[in-house]
Amino acid sequence: MAGAMRKMAVYLGLVEDDGYDGRGFDPDDDFEPELDPEPERDRRRHEPPHQSHQALHPQRDESVRVVQPPMQRDPVPHSASLPAESVRPARIAPVASITQERQSLEKNAPVIMPKVVSEREPYRITTLHPRTYNEARTIGEHFREGTPVIMNLTEMDDTDAKRLVDFAAGLVFGLHGSIERVTQKVFLLSPANVDVTAEDKARIAEGGFFNQS
């Protein structure tokens, strides 16, 4: 209210306006006292630099998240994880020792000789002329010694001849030999270890051995 009355007094010239600065006065304008900028500038001039900087740029109250890099583990050397035996270089045997060892093995190895088939052993065929069955013992002894026997039964009767043939068949069977009929009453008894040739069998058939005893 006092301000309005002062404005009116100034307008009527009753009161001198101390703050008149030569500008036009409009009674309708709201009167706002002007602040002197000088004290503010003086205050800023005397303030320390960091305070003025803080006043101009206020510090933001924000939490800054610091991201720490992950911890790095020290690399483990490869040589530490490997056993000592694997790190050692392989020993290479000298060529000379390998050659000597091979020669020693070849020398000690048994030598396998090929089996040589021996030539047919010579044999002598015995011709017997039994007259009775009692001579069967003589036939058995020659045959058991490995001698081929020509059994000529032409001088025996049929009954004794038949009995002697049965004996010869049993003898050959027991000693793993063979019996062959040459003629009606002539038989060849061959031991297991003797192979009578075809030429000798032909001669027997022709009667070449009949006279041997």
Curated annotation (Swiss-Prot):
Pfam (any one): SepF
> Cellular component terms, GO, for this chain's entry?
cytoplasm
Residues of the region (Disordered) are 16-63
Q: Which stretches does UniProt call biased (Acidic residues)?
A: 27-39
Q: Which UniProt keywords apply?
A: Cell cycle, Cell division, Cytoplasm, Septation
Q: Does the keyword Cell cycle apply?
A: yes
**Localization in the cell:** Cytoplasm
Question: Does Magnesium appear among the keywords?
Answer: no
Q: Which family does it belong to?
A: Belongs to the SepF family.
Which HAMAP family does the record cross-reference, listed alphabetically? SepF
Subunit organization: Homodimer. Interacts with FtsZ.
Name assigned to this protein: Cell division protein SepF 2
Q: Which organism is it from?
A: Streptomyces avermitilis (strain ATCC 31267 / DSM 46492 / JCM 5070 / NBRC 14893 / NCIMB 12804 / NRRL 8165 / MA-4680)
